[in-house]
From Swiss-Prot:
Native organism taxonomy: Eukaryota, Metazoa, Chordata, Craniata, Vertebrata
Entry superkingdom: Eukaryota
A Gene Ontology cellular-component term: mitochondrial inner membrane
Subcellular location: Mitochondrion inner membrane
The organism of origin for this protein: Homo sapiens
Name used for this protein in its record: NADH dehydrogenase [ubiquinone] 1 beta subcomplex subunit 6
Modified residues (N-acetylthreonine): T2
The family this protein is said to belong to: Belongs to the complex I NDUFB6 subunit family.
Length: 128
């Protein structure tokens, strides 16, 4: 037996038609894609309304606003972060870093005064 049976031919024809329809459905119409409307925040709404009138001073005010936001976020905030880190984590000034003082033993010399710590007295009758 050679060739396809009538059922197989019908199935192949239906699959080809389904594939043609699917490919045709993938083509976008001129009005697609439909994008959802953008939600604007309160500041963006304000600036859009403010800039509707195209006067030069309004554009200058908006430019100054944009530059000040840039300076605040890219200069001041990083400088504050670096200052905080340097002040509380790196500096050796008094109270900059609080750390535990090292132990002092008999015979040690105190650097600031040059004083030598005397040996401890022995108390033979007390048991600690």
């Amino acid at each position: 037996m050679t060739g396809y049976t009538p059922d197989e031919k019908l199935r192949l024809q239906q699959l080809r038609e389904l594939r043609r329809r699917w490919l045709k459905d993938q083509e976008l119409s001129p009005r697609e894609p439909v994008l959802p409307p953008q939600k604007m925040g309160p500041m963006e709404k304000f600036w859009n309304k403010f800039l509707e009138n195209k006067s030069p001073w309004r554009k200058m005010v908006h430019g100054v606003y944009k530059k000040s936001i840039f300076v605040f976020t890219h200069v001041l905030v990083p400088v504050w972060i670096i200052h905080y880190y340097m002040k509380y984590h790196v500096s050796e000034k008094p109270y900059g870093i609080v750390e535990k003082k090292s132990r002092i033993f008999p015979g040690d010399t105190i650097l600031e005064t040059g004083e030598v710590i005397p040996p401890m007295k022995e108390f033979p009758d007390q048991h600690h």
